[in-house]
Regions:
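Extended charged
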Residues: 1-173
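Short, charged surface segments at domain edges that flank catalytic/cofactor-binding sites
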Residues: 165-202
Length: 202
């Protein structure tokens, strides 16, 4: 249990360059791993992952206790981000995950995006899962990372290193279109979708 917590924490922090908190919770005799970007005020969202009945991998994504800001930002995501979100969702479906996404207790549809989000509940399942423990844990860690990418695709996140890069690019490149192109290519979510659409295995 502690080893898997460490694997999840290291993978997420190395990939996203931000601190994460992993909490193991026992529910009905099963260990649930609750993962979230580190914040003391519980203002973001959590990804909860567990193995159910030893045959099904389950991922649930939901806002934290004081996640109103995140709900508002997701609700007002521009159409470009909404499109990226649904493309990523389809990619996960093509990887064998069954999904159920609801907002305000109604199905979230591409042509019906609520402008007010009071709550959201995204659930994905994968069955069957490998019998080999190491292989199963590798899939679990990978799918948790994908789950965070799914939500991050709707949010505006810019790190300092990227800002510094863009400032230098403005001085050398000089056009808005080139800067937008650089930003897009450096975004790991966009890059992953591009590779996926071109038929590369990711």
């Amino acid at each position: 249990m502690e080893e898997l917590c460490l694997k999840l924490k290291q993978d997420l922090e190395n990939y996203f360059s931000m601190p994460f908190e992993i909490q193991p919770v026992f529910k009905d005799g099963e260990v649930h791993y609750v993962c979230s970007p580190y914040n003391e005020d519980q203002m973001y969202f959590s990804v909860e992952v567990y193995i159910h009945n030893k045959i099904r991998l389950v991922i649930e994504i939901y806002p934290q206790k004081h996640g109103g800001y995140i709900l508002n930002e997701m609700a007002h995501a521009p159409e470009e981000k909404q499109s990226t979100f649904f493309s990523y969702k389809q990619m996960l479906v093509d990887k064998g995950l069954k999904s159920c996404y609801s907002v305000n207790k109604s199905d979230l549809l591409e042509n019906k995006w609520p402008i007010t989000w009071r709550t959201f509940d995204f659930k994905m399942t994968k069955i069957p899962i490998p019998d080999n423990v190491n292989e199963c844990e590798s899939i679990l860690v990978e799918l948790v990372r994908y789950s965070f990418e799914l939500i991050f695709s709707l949010l505006t996140i810019t790190d300092i290193s990227e800002e510094e890069f863009l400032q230098k690019a403005v001085q050398t490149e000089g056009t808005i279109q080139e800067i937008k192109s650089i930003r897009y290519e450096r975004n790991p979510i966009n890059r992953k979708l591009c590779l996926y659409k071109k038929g590369y295995k990711i």
